[in-house]
Amino acid sequence: MVYLIFQTFFRYILYIIGDIETLDYNFLRPEFHLWYVVSLSFWYLLAILLNKLNLNTFGKLSVFIILLGISFISRWYTDGIVEFVQENYYEEFTSYTLSYQRTLSFMPFFFAGFFMTKNTFTKIYSSIKNIKIGTVLFICSMFLVFLIVNDFYGIEALYRGSFGTYRFLDDGQGVTVYITKVISHYIIAGWLCYLIMNLASNKKSIFTKWGDHSLTIFIFHPLAVFLLRQTEFMSDWTPNTKLAAFLLISIPVTWILGSNNFVKGTKYICNPYNFFIKMVVHFKPANDKN
């Protein structure tokens, strides 16, 4: 329901600012960040089905390895699958349709957390004892990632998760380079996730508040992006200067979207199911005991 509401909303916004010429509500191609909502729905559905199997530790590990294998090879076949579906079933099918490729690409990260026990999570969260060391490792790792993304062809496209090999392999590069790049993707992304988990604090702060309000921040942050795209004052800036500016701008944007007032004002459209339940309870006859 959240996807339907905000897909409609953002399609209308894109029409107003002129990014699309015709106002249509294409629900098969998620706009901007909404791919995650679609992918999350598929992952939750699969998780519910797997939960019914009552898997033991070996079963969970086996299923995870299978899912990781599917994810690992999926981008090798993306272009062929897209072409096959376009020719035989749906001409407008792409790797973006219903977040098809990203659902497969990022599936291991969701199920790594899904299958992990609370005890394992606790050990990971507390494995770096010194917060200063963790912070230095994270900053250095992020710096290296920026260098890698800038210096190696197709790495950014690889991390986006939505493209086939034509976007991250040069002509003539084969399965060996594919395996190397995809492995590096999972290792680096997993390492950054590990560092972020260790930097998370149990103490109440503005960051934990933003974490509690992450859905609202996530849903509405494209409004700031669309606004910046309509301005031209950064057009002559270098990429690094733009990056620094965007990082600075993200702070007040997150502050506003994560504020109590904004969250309170948008809670019903961000959580439509809860709103529906409250309305049912509110209008339920007082003498109706059932």
How should each PLM-predicted stretch be described?
Residues L4-Y12, I65-D79, F138-F152, F218-L228:
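Aromatic-anchored segments of alpha-helical transmembrane domains
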Residues I5, L14-F121, L228:
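Hydrophobic alpha-helical segments with transmembrane-like composition
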Residues E31-V37, L98-F106, T180-I187, T241-I249:
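Alpha-helical transmembrane segments of polytopic membrane proteins
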Residues W35-I48, F106-M116, I187-N198, L247-N260:
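Hydrophobic cores of alpha-helical transmembrane segments in multi-pass inner/ER membrane proteins
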Residues L49-N54, A112-I124, I148-N150, M197-K204, ...:
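Structural signal for the C-terminal ends of transmembrane alpha-helices
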Residues G59-S71, I131-M142, G211-F218, C270-N271:
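Central hydrophobic cores of alpha-helical transmembrane segments
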Residues I124-T208, H213:
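Alpha-helical transmembrane segments and terminal signal-anchor/GPI-anchor hydrophobic tails
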Residues A200-S214, P222-N290:
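C-terminal "closing" transmembrane helix and its immediate cytosolic amphipathic cap
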